[in-house]
Amino acid sequence: LVSVVAIAHNEGNRIFSCLWSICENNCHFPIEIIVVNNHSTDNTESILKKLGVTYYNEEQKGPGFARQCGLNHAKGKYCVCIDSDTMYPPLYITTMTKALQQKGVMAAYALWSFLPDKHYSQTGLFFYEKLRDVYFNIQHLRRPELNVRGMVFAFQTDTAHKVGFRTDIIRGEDGSLALGLKKYGKIKFVRSRKARAVTGYGTISA
């Protein structure tokens, strides 16, 4: 079993697309989909009810609290973290899971692309992503945890329970967990486009 855990804060306009992309994934193993509604004040919860997806409310606001809530409820051997404003390719779950099945791998992270809009052109984003990817390849050699983003992050569930997400920081809870997991094994950099997610430009500042 693989647990796919999404966190959502006021994502009523985007969460359906995210969950649709996950449901369209090609998997040859069972998965469970969990959504953590993190103190949303829009129609996120009503959409989750209509969709019939398993969800939990986390009233303590912040990605650390939300991701820890998801981890607490995950039943799978592997946990795949996603964000509700992001879409995933058809082989995303399979590709990330295969990375975790490699000997000694405790966690895996992938890359992502951006949707162009009025603020960021397709050409500008193309060159930004190329430069970022080169930087990530260099940084992975010594500090891979600094590359990790929760929307493209997967890990061994049992070991993650030993470490846990930090809830005392505004951001960086994903990299902090990766740093803790590094004590138990390798962090795998999944460069394949089969695991490359697509998200909005807000992640540029993350």
Annotate each language-model stretch with its function.
Residues 10-24:
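Short, well-formed alpha-helical segments that are part of the catalytic scaffolds
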Residues 14-16, 41-50, 91:
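Acidic helix N-cap motif at the loop->helix transition within catalytic regions
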Residues 21, 37-45, 86:
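A conserved acidic beta->alpha catalytic loop
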Residues 79:
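Short aromatic/hydrophobic "clamp" motif used to bind/position activated sugar donors
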Residues 171-177:
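Acidic donor-binding loop at a coil-to-helix junction in glycosyltransferase catalytic cores
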